[in-house]
Swiss-Prot record:
Residues annotated as catalytic: D110 (nucleophile)
Organism: Shigella flexneri
InterPro entries: PsdUridine_synth_cat_dom_sf (IPR020103), PsdUridine_synth_RsuA/RluA (IPR006145), PsdUridine_synth_RsuA/RluB/E/F (IPR000748), PsdUridine_synth_RsuA/RluB_CS (IPR018496), RsuA_PseudoU_synthase (IPR050343), S4_RNA-bd (IPR002942), S4_RNA-bd_sf (IPR036986)
Region (Disordered): 251-290
Keywords tagged on the record: Isomerase, RNA-binding, rRNA processing
GO biological process: enzyme-directed rRNA pseudouridine synthesis
Family under the similarity heading: Belongs to the pseudouridine synthase RsuA family.
Molecular-function GO term, any one: RNA binding
Enzyme class: isomerase
EC number: 5.4.99.22
Full protein name: Ribosomal large subunit pseudouridine synthase B
Pfam families, per database record: PseudoU_synth_2, S4
Amino acid sequence: MSEKLQKVLARAGHGSRREIESIIEAGRVSVDGKIAKLGDRVEVTPGLKIRIDGHLISVRESAEQICRVLAYYKPEGELCTRNDPEGRPTVFDRLPKLRGARWIAVGRLDVNTCGLLLFTTDGELANRLMHPSREVEREYAVRVFGQVDDAKLRDLSRGVQLEDGPAAFKTIKFSGGEGINQWYNVTLTEGRNREVRRLWEAVGVQVSRLIRVRYGDIPLPKGLPRGGWTELDLAQTNYLRELVELPPETSSKVAVEKDRRRMKANQIRRAVKRHSQVSGSRRSGGRNNG
């Protein structure tokens, strides 16, 4: 049975459907020696030859693939791009290397935003999770600078007009702070560019800190350091797949217990290092005072 070319490539882990549509339109994809066009359909057979930028790529049936998902704690200062011409750090720099597949980011976070960013090897899963029609919840912890009153909160809940259309928070909950520096937890069901910041700016309030803490029911893992990643287990992966009406996986490549032990070992090493630094400074201080 034939399928759209971009769907086949996305499922095989060569990018999100949106990314693949762009490279097809740019004439970078060929099928059996002919330049592909957007809308072309292919049937996956052993003799099928698909090339991207002249390089022969693997297109295996989805049944042969194992969907993998990473939870990454993006720090501020990293770009959501594979390569930066200026050599700045990107979210892909620290991810584990793959053979025969690649990590696809589920959405984006702007350079000054930190927190949970999901990656998957399944382009179709990434595409569906990002699509606005799925209305997958994203939760953010936001520190704002400015006067926030009931009228502004009401506007943010009911909706304000942005340059790319109306927008609103699904929920807003005060979570601490005093004066003009306050924390709120907010949720959205779409991922427009800088939407959280633009919503607050629309009511005259600046965002001074922004952390994504949840995607769907997947929270930012406790104990995960900034720049660290952990791979989701089979139950969490299948939760995401079922959320967007994809068939569940029956096996996983992740050794979850090994991953948890690695996180725990890293925490212990950091604690030992801090203790050694404190002890050393105390001894040094004692000698100076003597």
